[in-house]
């Protein structure tokens, strides 16, 4: 009789990973193939790698991007963080957006790299943990949270019009203290404005 060990996802080791979404001026994102000899070699991903002992997410990102691609980010913007479970481990991805860097990206570990349209990634297979990034990258960079209970509706709409004029396209209206009638009263003008 064979012993089968069933592990719960929460019991799997958690690996912290710094990930870079490097975006060119024309909107393309840089994808890198996992090099031969590494786990999941041949799969494509956003560049990055595991934290070393004592490193912050920013330090791990800068080190990994330089080691893998030979570039130094001028600024890396913390963007999203999430966990993903593989059969043998869990990863926590600390994802950064990079729009400016020094150097020319190249596969310094023998890996192929490719500039891809984030709406139509051609390289495959992709590591599954990267799918969430591809969903979120379609959202606008600027996300406004509102608190309507602290202002009048007229003032709120004036501010909202200015934000729309400045290019804001994603707004979350905090409605914790609103009844359905108040919610309808505030959302109708917002929908018309959009």
Residue ranges and their predicted role:
Residues 71-81, 96-97:
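A short coil-to-beta-strand element that immediately follows conserved catalytic motifs
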Residues 24, 82-104, 119:
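Active-site-adjacent beta-strand/loop module that shapes the phosphate/pyrophosphate-binding cleft
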Residues 4, 28-68, 80:
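Conserved Nudix-box catalytic region and its N-terminal flanking loop in Nudix hydrolases
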């Amino acid at each position: 009789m064979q012993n089968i060990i069933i592990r719960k996802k929460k019991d799997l080791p958690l690996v912290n990973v710094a990930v870079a979404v490097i975006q060119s001026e024309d909107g393309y994102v840089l994808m890198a193939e996992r090099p031969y000899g590494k786990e999941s070699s041949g799969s494509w991903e956003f560049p990055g790698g595991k934290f070393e002992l004592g490193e912050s997410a920013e330090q791990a990102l800068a080190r990994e991007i330089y080691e893998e691609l030979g570039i130094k980010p001028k600024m890396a913007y913390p963007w999203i963080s999430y966990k993903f479970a593989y059969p043998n481990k869990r990863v926590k991805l600390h994802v950064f957006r990079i729009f400016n860097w020094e150097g020319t990206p190249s596969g310094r570990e023998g890996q192929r790299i490719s500039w891809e349209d984030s709406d139509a990634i051609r390289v495959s297979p992709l590591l599954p943990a990267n799918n969430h990034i591809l969903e979120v990258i379609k959202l606008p960079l600027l996300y406004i949270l509102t608190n309507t209970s602290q202002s009048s509706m007229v003032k709120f709409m004036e501010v909202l019009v200015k934000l729309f004029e400045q290019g804001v396209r994603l707004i979350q209206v905090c409605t914790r203290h609103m009844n359905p009638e108040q919610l309808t009263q505030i959302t109708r003008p917002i929908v018309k404005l959009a």
